[in-house]
């Protein structure tokens, strides 16, 4: 017959919880967070709570020593699956920088999820928040995603948006480029490559986007159009097509653009999978005639630069971006300003002649 001893112990612990809180000078909610090893409590407060628990014999001394040993912060990175090699490079970074991040005491995990699906992204953010102490992800502008971010904020689980930000949420920080400036940079490069036009002739330029549900892509488009209006009135933007960062779709969309505009002078790939764009240009025999600027230095875009099918790549360091995410999360864990000591993302423009 069950004597009820475990239940008695549970009652004793419940009765002692307010005593631990009083002795430590904190709330019972803080005690609960510490004893269940949830994030968001300053290290000094954690130590005070654990010592109070040991003094009141709420926590055996051996358990106290074990609890005082810092547990790794569990971090999840949610990245879109697909053929975007630069995104895959960011995920791979988590694996090979593991030892480099040892001083931060973190345990990182990468999940690849369906691209351009806001409901799936929102579900994945919430699911990750149940088991992780911090979640980083590429955001999509959608009410369901905003709600997921704010739900985790209420649970004291920090979130960091990576590459593409989201508006009107309680996300902790954004890691990535100034995307409006990136779009303006692309327009400037294409405008200069094309060169001056007479008042009677215009040059046609087109854009390929992953999806404008990415705020990053929307901002790049806005910056791109804005600079042409300001500085290159002789250049006409004739269209924007979405290829969902998929090489096959980008190939098909570029083929259509080239058929509709055989005199196309420039293409700006706002997102990834530039190899699909270049393949269509090469098949049409215009790879060395049409100015092509895109994003993300990867083995694919590197090869395109070398063979002259691509003119410039606007990129950022995947290692710096992922390390910045880790630093932000550990700052939050340690009660510091989230962006304290975090390196601001810087864009680089890579040509064939300055390949690193």
Regions found by a protein language model. Name each.
Residues 1-65:
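N-terminal helix-turn-helix DNA-binding module of bacterial transcription factors
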Residues 144-181, 298-306:
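Flexible loop/hinge segments that line or gate small-molecule binding clefts
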Residues 134-135, 139-153, 224, 239-299:
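Hydrophobic alpha-helical
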Residues 60-123:
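Amphipathic helical "hinge" segments at domain boundaries
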Residues 80-87, 109-120, 141, 176-184, ...:
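Hinge/beta->alpha junction and helix N-cap segments in small-molecule ligand-binding domains
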Residues 212, 228, 317-356:
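Hinge/cleft segment of the Venus flytrap/periplasmic-binding protein
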Residues 122, 126, 190-193, 207, ...:
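Non-catalytic structural scaffold of enzyme domains
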Residues 174-202, 250-251, 297, 301, ...:
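Hydrophobic alpha-helical segments within soluble ligand-binding/sensing domains
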